[in-house]
UniProtKB/Swiss-Prot annotation:
Key words of the record: Cell inner membrane, Cell membrane, Membrane, Toxin-antitoxin system, Transmembrane, Transmembrane helix
Protein family per UniProt: Belongs to the Ldr toxic peptide family.
Location in the cell: Cell inner membrane
Recorded topology in the membrane: Single-pass membrane protein
Transmembrane segments: 10-30
Name under which the protein is recorded: Small toxic polypeptide LdrB
Free-text function comment from the UniProt entry: Toxic component of a type I toxin-antitoxin (TA) system. Overexpression causes rapid cell killing, probably by disrupting the cell inner membrane and disruption of ATP synthesis.
Main location: membrane
Pfam families per record: Ldr_toxin
InterPro entries reported for this sequence: Toxin_Ldr (IPR025253)
Entry annotated with the keyword Membrane: yes
Native species: Escherichia coli (strain K12)
Induction: Expression of the proteinaceous toxin is probably controlled by an antisense sRNA, in this case rdlB. Only a few of these TA systems have been mechanistically characterized; the mechanisms used to control expression of the toxin gene are not necessarily the same.
Length: 35
């Protein structure tokens, strides 16, 4: 595994949950403000 492949794998493993958390928080915040 090259350094670039390691960096890409690490980025995807790190970025995917963070992005999902931000999207979830945004939807929950919007839903609560809507009620």
């Amino acid at each position: 595994m090259t350094l670039a492949q390691f960096a890409m794998t690490f980025w995807h493993d790190l970025a995917a949950p963070i992005l999902a958390g931000i999207i979830t928080a945004a939807i929950v915040g919007w839903w609560r403000n809507r009620k």
